[in-house]
Every structure is written in structure tokens, then in C-alpha cells.
A protein has these predicted regions:
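Sec-dependent N-terminal signal peptides
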Residues: 4-14
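Amphipathic, charged alpha-helical segments and their helix-to-coil junctions
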Residues: 21-175
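Hydrophobic alpha-helical membrane-insertion segments, chiefly the h-region
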Residues: 17-18
């Protein structure tokens, strides 16, 4: 008798889980599509790219000035008095240090100004995207929405559940 009750309880549990699973509605978005087609995200990326290009140009100028000074030093090395050699060497060391400091300050992985600026510029963009995703999820009665282009691996996705363009539309309409 206990054996039959156990089997019946397993069957009911299985039926209950199957019923619960059929009520789940899952969708996905491709955040890369949103970031490349939504005007606010495009502008933000353009601003970040402009800043990166500006700092890269400054770094290139500093490096070229250093290389020119090092070449001049090498050419004049044999004719320079000892005190001038020492001063030129100190200048070169200082220039090299300035280049390294600038590179670290602007571009250091995770701590450089470019990463801080990225977070600052894209924080409101991400908030708007998440808000639009939430609205679409509620409108569509979805329980879960995954990002197809994120770290979550999505091995198969039926395009019927793709809500990327609904989210993009919501962002473009500003609602």
C-alpha cells in the first residue's frame, strides 16, 4: 500500500511540475542589436569613441616627442658634454614616466578614466533598456527574458520569442 501511495505522489508531483512548466513564458533580446540601432546608445558610444580617440592622439604625440628626443640624444651623444648627457637622460626618463602615467591614468584595465567614463555614460542607457525590457515582459506576459548576446549561453531560440525589436521600439518611442 505504501508503495502505491509513493508512486501516486510521484505521478502527481510530475503532473504538477509539468503544468507549472507549461505556464512559463520565456523571451530573449539581443542587446547588441539594441545598442547598435538605438540612437541614444549610438550617441553614447560615439561620445566614448571620441574621448578614446582624443586620449590616444595625446598618447601618440607624447610618444613621438619622446622618440624624437631619444633619436636626437643618440645622434649628439658623442659630442655632448657630460652634464648635458645627464640632463638629457633625466629628461628622457621623465618623458617615459609621463607616458606610462598617462597610459595608466586613461586606459588601465578597470581603473582607467575610459572605463569610469564608460560606466558613467552607459549607466542611464542600461537603466532605460532594463526598464523597456521589463515593460515588454509584462505586456507579453513573460516570466523570463534572456540576453542572447550576453554571458548566458542560449543554444537555441525560436524567433517567435525574440522581443528585441519590441524593446527597441519601446526605447525609440520613449515609453
Amino acid at each position: 500500500m505504501k508503495k502505491y501511495l509513493f508512486i501516486l505522489s510521484i505521478l502527481f508531483l510530475g503532473v504538477g511540475l509539468t503544468a507549472a512548466q507549461t505556464n512559463q513564458k520565456i523571451g530573449y533580446v539581443d542587446s547588441q542589436v539594441i545598442l547598435t540601432q538605438w540612437s541614444e546608445a549610438i550617441k553614447a558610444q560615439g561620445d566614448l569613441d571620441a574621448l578614446t580617440n582624443k586620449w590616444s592622439s595625446q598618447l601618440d604625440s607624447m610618444t613621438q616627442a619622446y622618440q624624437q628626443k631619444a633619436n636626437d640624444y643618440q645622434k649628439q651623444l658623442n659630442t655632448m658634454p657630460e652634464d648635458k648627457k645627464l640632463a638629457a637622460q633625466q629628461d628622457l626618463v621623465q618623458m617615459e614616466q609621463n607616458i606610462m602615467n598617462f597610459r595608466k591614468e586613461k586606459f588601465a584595465q578597470g581603473t582607467g578614466e575610459i572605463y569610469k567614463k564608460n560606466d558613467e555614460i552607459f549607466a542611464p542607457i542600461k537603466d532605460k533598456i532594463y526598464d523597456a525590457i521589463g515593460k515588454v515582459a509584462k505586456e507579453e506576459g513573460m516570466n523570463f527574458i534572456f540576453d542572447k548576446s550576453g554571458d548566458i549561453i542560449l543554444l537555441y531560440a525560436d524567433s517567435a520569442f525574440d522581443v528585441t525589436y519590441k524593446v527597441l521600439d519601446k526605447l525609440k518611442r520613449g515609453s
